[in-house]
Regions:
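SF2 helicase/translocase NTPase motor core
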Residues: 19-47, 53, 63, 74-148, ...
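Signature of the SF2 helicase/ATPase Hel1-core->accessory helical subdomain module
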Residues: 81-84, 130-201, 459, 469-484, ...
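ATP-dependent helicase/translocase motor core
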Residues: 1-70, 77-85, 667, 672, ...
Length: 770
């Protein structure tokens, strides 16, 4: 319905206008800060330029940003384009992607330092930088690791650009961990997240997602216009549940695994984790299980020797149970050697006997394998297409290659590669498999690789879009891996319209024990709640996040209304533009938060009786669409809605001004006050002044890295110089925040809510922040 102009009413401070005039303000408020005056490099594709402008507009305000576009849309190029605005750029990337990042930067004429995740884990420092780009940033979700600590402290003074299509892997705390690399705990208080830590602890994921959206670009291919060919569309093909050995043998083997006691381990849930690890290996192949059982046997031998000699085993001993790149590396902190004593020796000897019996029961290499036979049929039927087969274990990959004689096949895993003639480098193997995507020389037919069997080493970030077929031979532990695997093929630069995705499901006896499909489905639901643009479930390669798509479509819808009558000029004086329409008592406001010269637009929507802030994107989309559909009204805006808008904004400003309230900040403040009290008793005036400055900076809020640096200083004997240096590294103190209203679209209350549109009983997480 066309929007008619309102009558000639006017209230103090309000300037009546049409809904289409307000629409442009709402569109800008939906997508957040944007560097409109910056022209991105010409080598970006049309759909990448708005992303670069949004990231460039966000970094100076929050000290960081999250680029979470779906896999295959060219996040590397967007990040490098933003890097052209900085003098010193460091990219922190997985080791497998270092060469690709360097090649891409060189091809674009850019100078960057590249540091690997693994290098940080080994204690390497980050070079001085103005911008730190963290590729596959979800690998830094564990705050207890050395790599997280190195990154947090090394990037504390720089702008941080997080690049990942999966900012949430298992739970909402994953997102908060990486955001705290550049945000203080209250860094999103003005936009509705009073405390990052408290919000995720209370599982208010809708509120967390709405607040984090102002510094996030997370789009799917479904919400973007493409000038050229779109990334291939995944086509799912289910291969069923063939077992890795005969059905009767499988049942007998499972019975023997059930008898294992995993003697010699401690830690919460250690036995369950280790049993799941063995079952997961069996789901892959007998060869993978054989290798893991040999590791368990070696561990038992060491434990028996330790018991006989009165020694204890180190934690590193238990790490040898897991292969390089094993997903269960994530849970190694929960699996540790038990205290070894003579009473344990008898139990260890019995466990060793059970392991030997299990190893002797396993069929020999080359045994009947229905799962491998089914895979061979798939590859043979597509012999002219390049195929990537993802397995959970290198031993499985090698076994499969041997089964079909290494015909034009390469195996990649654990940082190594092999073809029929012997070992080669990983880069060489990938170049042979995907010469077009990797801009390498085409090999001779004899050296060409048509089938790549790989672990998830190659599932992240690599350009392998010469391939058109992906086979999930084994299921990983998280949907993240599934989406990343498909992303090697379904990405920009592919000449294929479709990507064929084949699924092997675990045999029924194993699925009943592992619940792999259910685990993946549950984690996918969590991802969809918080800023993950698309994910996978077993049997569905691409499941789009309709909430994030709605956010992009909401901005487009508002922009279309703004263009419908050519409105959208500057407002007169400081008046607030308002459009009142006939409709339910609902309100959508484009507000602008300002502090330290920065400006952050945000969309605030109120509805219900009494009016409350609405956080769910689906409800917001429905409200705004309903308001746009109604004709203009001559009535004044409902006073209850206007008061509710003001109170909502006032409460957020109050919470912003209160500063951080997280336990880490409070603890540091107590430590600094204790140091100050001691310095006062000693009449140490030289130390009191910098301690006072430190308290001021803590009151403004600091990211995790600066908090940890201060802890180290306080652990030692702090000097005026060390405290002053810490203050010098802190970002400028945050001044008081203010709010202005760019435009308000409101229903006058003359039309009641339709059945199903009652917003009084929204999702429990949809409430105003008080």
């Amino acid at each position: 319905m066309a929007v008619r102009e309102p009558g000639a009413w006017k209230l103090d401070g309000l300037e009546p206008c049409s809904a289409s005039t307000i629409a442009l303000c709402l569109a800008e408020a939906t997508i957040g800060p944007t560097a409109h005056t910056w022209t991105p490099p010409a080598w970006l594709l049309p759909h990448q330029r708005p992303a670069a402008q949004r990231i460039a507009g966000t970094l100076p305000i929050f000290g960081g940003a999250l680029l979470a576009d779906a896999v295959g849309l060219g996040k590397t190029y967007v990040a490098l384009a933003v890097g052209t605005r900085y003098a010193r750029v460091v990219a922190v990337v997985p080791a497998a992607l270092r060469a690709q990042w360097r090649r891409t930067a060189e091809r674009l004429g850019l100078q960057i330092d590249v540091v690997s995740h693994e290098g940080l884990s080994r204690g390497r420092d980050i070079p001085g930088a103005d911008l730190v780009i963290v590729d596959e940033a979800h690998h830094f979700r564990n705050r207890g690791t050395q790599r997280y600590d190195r990154l947090a402290r090394g990037a504390a003074s720089a702008h941080v650009l997080l690049v990942t299509a999966t900012p949430v892997v298992n739970r909402g705390a994953d997102l908060v961990a990486i955001l705290r690399l550049f945000l203080p705990d209250h860094g999103l208080a003005a936009v509705g997240v009073r405390s990052l830590e408290q919000t995720v602890a209370s599982r208010d994921y809708i509120i967390l997602a709405e607040g984090a959206a102002v510094l996030t670009v997370a789009r799917t291919s479904g919400s973007l216009p493409f000038a050229g060919q779109r990334p291939p569309r995944p086509v799912d093909l289910d291969l069923g549940r063939p077992p890795p050995l005969g059905a009767r043998q499988l049942v007998s083997l499972l019975a023997r695994i059930d008898r294992l006691r995993f003697t010699g381990f401690s830690g919460p849930g250690a036995v369950s984790l280790l049993r799941a690890h063995l079952l997961h290996r069996l789901a892959s192949s007998v060869e993978a299980l054989r290798l893991t059982l040999r590791r368990h046997l070696a561990y038992a031998d060491r434990a028996v020797t330790a018991a006989q000699s009165g020694m204890q085993l180190s934690r590193s001993t238990s790490r040898r149970l897991f292969g390089a790149g094993d997903d269960l590396q994530l849970v190694i902190p929960f699996v540790a050697p038990a205290a070894i004593d003579h009473d344990l020796e008898t139990a260890l000897v019995a466990e060793r006997a059970r392991l030997l019996d299990l190893l002797q029961f396993l069929p020999k290499r080359g045994h009947r394998n229905p799962k491998a036979v089914r895979l061979a049929q798939v590859i043979h039927s597509r012999s002219q297409l390049r195929v990537i087969v993802f397995t959970a274990a290198v031993s499985t990959a090698i076994d499969l290659a041997f089964r079909w004689g290494w015909r034009r096949t390469a195996v990649v895993g654990a940082g190594r590669a092999r073809i029929a003639s012997g070992p080669i480098s990983v880069d060489d193997a990938l170049d042979r498999f995907a010469p077009n995507a990797r801009h390498s020389r085409h090999p001779s037919r004899a050296g060409d690789v048509m089938t790549l069997i790989a672990t998830d080493l190659v599932s992240e970030g690599l350009d392998l879009q010469d391939a058109v077929v992906v086979v999930h031979y084994d299921l990983p532990w998280t949907p993240v891996r599934l989406a990343q695997r498909v992303g090697r093929v379904a990405r920009l630069g592919s000449t294929h319209r479709n990507a064929h995705v084949f699924w092997f499901r675990p045999p029924a006896p194993l699925e009943q024990r592992l619940h792999m499909e259910r685990r993946i489905a549950m984690k996918a639901v969590t991802q969809m709640e918080i800023l993950v643009p698309e994910t996978s479930r077993v049997g569905t390669a691409r499941k789009l996040n309709t909430l994030l798509e709605l956010r992009e479509h909401l901005s487009l819808m508002c922009a279309e209304h703004a263009r419908s009558d050519g409105s959208g000029g500057p407002r007169s004086d400081d008046a607030v533009r308002i459009a009142v329409v006939c409709g339910p008592p609902m309100l959508a406001a484009a507000v602008r938060w300002t502090w330290n010269g920065h400006s952050v637009p945000q969309l605030v929507v109120l509805a219900g009786r009494p009016p409350r802030a609405v956080h769910d994107v689906r409800s917001i989309f429905r409200i705004i669409r309903r308001l746009f559909a109604n004709s203009a009204s001559r009535r004044a805006p409902p006073a209850t809605l206007m008061r509710a808008l003001w109170h909502t904004c006032r409460d957020r400003l109050t919470e912003w001004g209160q500063g951080p309230t997280d336990s880490a900040t409070r603890r540091l403040q107590r430590r600094v006050l204790a140091r100050g009290l001691a310095a006062s008793r000693q009449h140490n005036l030289q130390l009191l002044t910098p301690l006072d400055d430190v308290l001021d900076h803590l009151g403004s809020g600091q990211p995790t890295g600066m908090e940890r640096e201060l802890d180290r200083i306080l652990d030692a004997k702090p000097s005026p110089g060390s405290l002053a240096a810490w203050c010098g590294r802190c970002r400028p103190r945050v001044g008081p925040a203010d709010v202005q209203f760019d435009g308000i679209l409101v229903g006058d209350g003359t039309i009641g809510e339709l059945p199903g549109e009652a917003f009084e009983n929204l999702h429990s997480a949809q409430h105003s922040i008080h």
